[in-house]
Amino acid sequence: MQILCIGDVVGSHGCDFLRRTLPAFKRTKGIDVVIANGENSSDGNGITPASANHLLDSGVDIITTGNHTDRRREFYDYIDESDCVIRPANFPPEAPGKGMTVLDLGRTQIAVINLMGNVYLDEHLACPFRTLDTLLKTPDLPKICIVDFHAEATGEKRAFGYYADGRVSAVFGTHTHVQTADETVLPKGTGYITDVGMTGPINSVLGVRAELVIKKQISKMPVRFDFADGPCKLDCILFDIDEKTGLTRSTERFSLR
Protein backbone atom coordinates (compact mmCIF):
# COMPACT_ATOMS: atom_id res chain seq x y z
CA MET A 1 0.00 0.00 0.00
CA GLN A 2 1.49 3.30 -1.14
CA ILE A 3 0.30 6.23 0.99
CA LEU A 4 1.42 9.77 0.17
CA CYS A 5 1.33 12.47 2.85
CA ILE A 6 1.61 16.10 1.71
CA GLY A 7 2.83 19.08 3.72
CA ASP A 8 0.71 22.14 4.57
CA VAL A 9 -0.86 23.49 1.37
CA VAL A 10 -0.52 27.29 1.34
CA GLY A 11 -3.10 29.44 -0.43
CA SER A 12 -4.44 29.30 -3.95
CA HIS A 13 -0.96 29.06 -5.45
CA GLY A 14 -0.27 25.93 -3.40
CA CYS A 15 -3.64 24.46 -4.36
CA ASP A 16 -3.07 25.17 -8.04
CA PHE A 17 0.45 23.70 -7.99
CA LEU A 18 -0.87 20.57 -6.29
CA ARG A 19 -3.55 20.22 -8.96
CA ARG A 20 -0.94 20.48 -11.72
CA THR A 21 1.59 18.17 -10.07
CA LEU A 22 -0.22 15.47 -8.11
CA PRO A 23 -2.07 13.43 -10.79
CA ALA A 24 1.04 12.53 -12.79
CA PHE A 25 3.04 11.83 -9.63
CA LYS A 26 0.31 9.47 -8.40
CA ARG A 27 0.44 7.54 -11.65
CA THR A 28 4.24 7.37 -11.69
CA LYS A 29 4.52 6.08 -8.12
CA GLY A 30 1.41 3.90 -8.07
CA ILE A 31 0.00 5.81 -5.11
CA ASP A 32 -3.13 4.35 -3.49
CA VAL A 33 -4.07 7.07 -0.99
CA VAL A 34 -3.23 10.77 -0.63
CA ILE A 35 -3.46 12.68 2.67
CA ALA A 36 -2.76 16.43 2.71
CA ASN A 37 -2.75 19.06 5.44
CA GLY A 38 -5.00 21.84 4.17
CA GLU A 39 -5.35 24.20 7.14
CA ASN A 40 -3.74 27.11 5.21
CA SER A 41 -5.21 26.33 1.80
CA SER A 42 -7.39 29.44 1.60
CA ASP A 43 -5.96 32.84 0.71
CA GLY A 44 -6.06 34.99 3.82
CA ASN A 45 -5.47 32.12 6.27
CA GLY A 46 -7.45 29.06 7.26
CA ILE A 47 -9.43 26.64 5.12
CA THR A 48 -12.77 27.12 3.37
CA PRO A 49 -15.21 24.77 1.65
CA ALA A 50 -13.89 26.03 -1.70
CA SER A 51 -10.22 25.34 -0.91
CA ALA A 52 -11.06 21.94 0.59
CA ASN A 53 -13.03 20.98 -2.52
CA HIS A 54 -10.13 22.18 -4.68
CA LEU A 55 -7.80 19.73 -2.93
CA LEU A 56 -10.27 16.84 -3.03
CA ASP A 57 -10.97 17.43 -6.73
CA SER A 58 -7.21 17.40 -7.38
CA GLY A 59 -6.72 13.85 -6.07
CA VAL A 60 -6.44 14.25 -2.30
CA ASP A 61 -8.44 11.61 -0.40
CA ILE A 62 -8.26 12.95 3.16
CA ILE A 63 -7.54 16.50 4.37
CA THR A 64 -6.06 17.06 7.82
CA THR A 65 -5.84 20.43 9.56
CA GLY A 66 -4.42 22.11 12.66
CA ASN A 67 -4.45 25.32 14.68
CA HIS A 68 -6.02 27.36 11.86
CA THR A 69 -8.97 25.00 11.38
CA ASP A 70 -11.52 27.35 12.94
CA ARG A 71 -10.35 30.63 11.37
CA ARG A 72 -13.19 30.67 8.81
CA ARG A 73 -16.72 30.32 10.15
CA GLU A 74 -18.06 29.23 6.77
CA PHE A 75 -16.03 26.06 7.23
CA TYR A 76 -17.77 24.92 10.43
CA ASP A 77 -20.80 23.24 8.83
CA TYR A 78 -18.64 21.80 6.06
CA ILE A 79 -16.25 19.97 8.39
CA ASP A 80 -19.16 18.83 10.55
CA GLU A 81 -20.69 17.05 7.57
CA SER A 82 -17.54 15.79 5.82
CA ASP A 83 -15.90 12.39 6.18
CA CYS A 84 -12.94 13.56 4.09
CA VAL A 85 -11.79 16.49 6.26
CA ILE A 86 -10.76 16.16 9.91
CA ARG A 87 -9.44 18.42 12.66
CA PRO A 88 -7.17 17.62 15.63
CA ALA A 89 -8.82 14.97 17.80
CA ASN A 90 -7.60 16.64 20.99
CA PHE A 91 -9.68 19.76 20.32
CA PRO A 92 -12.57 20.16 22.77
CA PRO A 93 -15.58 17.97 21.87
CA GLU A 94 -17.62 21.12 21.15
CA ALA A 95 -15.36 21.97 18.17
CA PRO A 96 -16.85 21.34 14.73
CA GLY A 97 -15.78 18.18 12.95
CA LYS A 98 -14.05 15.05 14.15
CA GLY A 99 -10.46 13.96 14.73
CA MET A 100 -10.44 10.58 13.01
CA THR A 101 -11.93 9.14 9.85
CA VAL A 102 -11.85 5.79 8.07
CA LEU A 103 -11.32 5.58 4.32
CA ASP A 104 -12.86 2.48 2.73
CA LEU A 105 -10.97 1.30 -0.35
CA GLY A 106 -13.02 -1.85 -0.79
CA ARG A 107 -10.21 -4.35 -0.32
CA THR A 108 -9.02 -2.61 2.84
CA GLN A 109 -9.71 0.32 5.15
CA ILE A 110 -7.40 3.07 6.38
CA ALA A 111 -7.82 5.11 9.54
CA VAL A 112 -6.48 8.67 9.55
CA ILE A 113 -5.98 10.50 12.86
CA ASN A 114 -5.23 14.21 13.31
CA LEU A 115 -3.61 15.45 16.54
CA MET A 116 -2.07 18.75 17.65
CA GLY A 117 0.89 19.34 19.93
CA ASN A 118 0.94 21.21 23.24
CA VAL A 119 4.51 22.58 23.32
CA TYR A 120 4.79 26.21 22.04
CA LEU A 121 1.40 25.81 20.34
CA ASP A 122 -1.56 25.21 22.67
CA GLU A 123 -0.76 23.90 26.13
CA HIS A 124 -4.44 23.94 27.07
CA LEU A 125 -5.45 21.25 24.58
CA ALA A 126 -5.91 17.69 25.76
CA CYS A 127 -2.70 15.66 25.75
CA PRO A 128 -2.14 14.26 22.24
CA PHE A 129 -0.40 11.19 23.66
CA ARG A 130 -3.37 10.23 25.83
CA THR A 131 -5.81 11.13 23.06
CA LEU A 132 -4.01 8.66 20.80
CA ASP A 133 -4.41 5.98 23.47
CA THR A 134 -8.15 6.57 23.52
CA LEU A 135 -8.53 6.54 19.74
CA LEU A 136 -6.57 3.31 19.36
CA LYS A 137 -9.18 1.60 21.55
CA THR A 138 -11.85 2.28 18.89
CA PRO A 139 -13.64 -1.00 18.05
CA ASP A 140 -12.77 -2.50 14.66
CA LEU A 141 -10.04 0.05 14.02
CA PRO A 142 -8.35 -0.72 10.67
CA LYS A 143 -4.89 -2.25 10.76
CA ILE A 144 -3.52 0.62 8.67
CA CYS A 145 -3.57 3.87 10.67
CA ILE A 146 -1.87 7.15 9.68
CA VAL A 147 -1.37 10.08 12.08
CA ASP A 148 -0.83 13.74 11.16
CA PHE A 149 0.82 15.26 14.25
CA HIS A 150 0.48 19.02 13.83
CA ALA A 151 3.04 20.42 16.25
CA GLU A 152 5.74 23.03 16.72
CA ALA A 153 8.48 21.40 18.79
CA THR A 154 10.80 18.82 17.26
CA GLY A 155 11.27 17.14 20.65
CA GLU A 156 7.54 16.70 21.16
CA LYS A 157 7.15 15.32 17.65
CA ARG A 158 9.96 12.81 18.00
CA ALA A 159 8.73 11.71 21.43
CA PHE A 160 5.29 11.18 19.95
CA GLY A 161 6.76 9.12 17.12
CA TYR A 162 8.41 6.72 19.55
CA TYR A 163 5.26 6.66 21.70
CA ALA A 164 3.23 5.59 18.66
CA ASP A 165 5.89 3.20 17.31
CA GLY A 166 4.43 -0.21 16.52
CA ARG A 167 0.91 1.01 17.31
CA VAL A 168 0.20 2.96 14.10
CA SER A 169 1.44 2.61 10.54
CA ALA A 170 3.00 6.05 10.16
CA VAL A 171 3.33 9.46 11.81
CA PHE A 172 4.01 12.53 9.68
CA GLY A 173 4.59 15.91 11.30
CA THR A 174 3.11 19.14 9.97
CA HIS A 175 2.88 22.84 10.96
CA THR A 176 6.41 24.27 10.61
CA HIS A 177 6.35 24.33 6.77
CA VAL A 178 10.03 23.24 6.75
CA GLN A 179 10.76 19.74 5.50
CA THR A 180 13.07 17.73 7.76
CA ALA A 181 15.56 15.12 6.57
CA ASP A 182 14.88 12.53 9.27
CA GLU A 183 12.42 10.23 7.52
CA THR A 184 12.79 6.71 8.89
CA VAL A 185 11.11 3.50 9.92
CA LEU A 186 11.18 3.40 13.72
CA PRO A 187 12.33 0.21 15.53
CA LYS A 188 8.84 -1.29 15.88
CA GLY A 189 7.77 -0.54 12.31
CA THR A 190 6.13 2.89 12.30
CA GLY A 191 7.11 5.22 9.46
CA TYR A 192 8.07 8.69 10.67
CA ILE A 193 9.13 12.20 9.64
CA THR A 194 9.30 15.22 11.97
CA ASP A 195 7.86 17.61 9.39
CA VAL A 196 6.86 16.83 5.83
CA GLY A 197 7.16 20.48 4.78
CA MET A 198 4.98 22.80 2.69
CA THR A 199 3.18 23.00 -0.62
CA GLY A 200 3.39 26.57 -1.84
CA PRO A 201 5.68 29.39 -2.98
CA ILE A 202 9.40 28.68 -2.76
CA ASN A 203 10.61 32.28 -2.46
CA SER A 204 8.77 33.09 0.75
CA VAL A 205 8.91 32.86 4.53
CA LEU A 206 6.82 29.77 5.23
CA GLY A 207 4.59 30.75 2.31
CA VAL A 208 4.26 34.45 3.24
CA ARG A 209 5.79 37.36 1.29
CA ALA A 210 9.26 37.79 2.76
CA GLU A 211 9.15 41.60 2.91
CA LEU A 212 6.08 41.49 5.16
CA VAL A 213 7.70 39.14 7.64
CA ILE A 214 10.87 41.26 7.63
CA LYS A 215 8.80 44.41 8.24
CA LYS A 216 7.16 42.79 11.26
CA GLN A 217 10.50 41.61 12.65
CA ILE A 218 12.05 45.07 12.35
CA SER A 219 9.09 47.26 13.37
CA LYS A 220 7.60 44.93 16.02
CA MET A 221 4.23 46.25 14.82
CA PRO A 222 1.25 44.26 13.53
CA VAL A 223 1.57 43.49 9.83
CA ARG A 224 -1.03 41.80 7.65
CA PHE A 225 0.53 38.74 6.07
CA ASP A 226 -0.21 37.87 2.43
CA PHE A 227 0.91 34.71 0.72
CA ALA A 228 3.72 35.01 -1.81
CA ASP A 229 3.47 34.07 -5.47
CA GLY A 230 5.98 32.75 -7.98
CA PRO A 231 7.43 29.23 -8.40
CA CYS A 232 6.05 26.61 -6.03
CA LYS A 233 7.05 23.25 -4.57
CA LEU A 234 5.15 20.26 -3.23
CA ASP A 235 6.76 18.63 -0.18
CA CYS A 236 5.60 15.10 0.61
CA ILE A 237 6.56 11.69 1.95
CA LEU A 238 5.62 8.28 0.57
CA PHE A 239 5.05 5.42 2.99
CA ASP A 240 5.14 1.85 1.65
CA ILE A 241 2.91 -0.03 4.10
CA ASP A 242 2.45 -3.78 4.48
CA GLU A 243 -1.30 -4.43 4.37
CA LYS A 244 -0.96 -7.62 6.42
CA THR A 245 0.95 -6.13 9.36
CA GLY A 246 -0.11 -2.49 9.00
CA LEU A 247 3.52 -1.45 9.45
CA THR A 248 5.80 0.60 7.20
CA ARG A 249 8.32 -1.15 4.97
CA SER A 250 10.04 1.98 3.67
CA THR A 251 9.77 5.76 3.39
CA GLU A 252 10.74 8.16 0.61
CA ARG A 253 10.78 11.94 0.90
CA PHE A 254 10.16 14.30 -2.04
CA SER A 255 10.15 18.01 -2.81
CA LEU A 256 8.56 18.36 -6.25
CA ARG A 257 9.38 21.51 -8.19
What positions do the PLM features span?
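Acidic, metal/ion-coordinating pockets
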Residues: 1-257
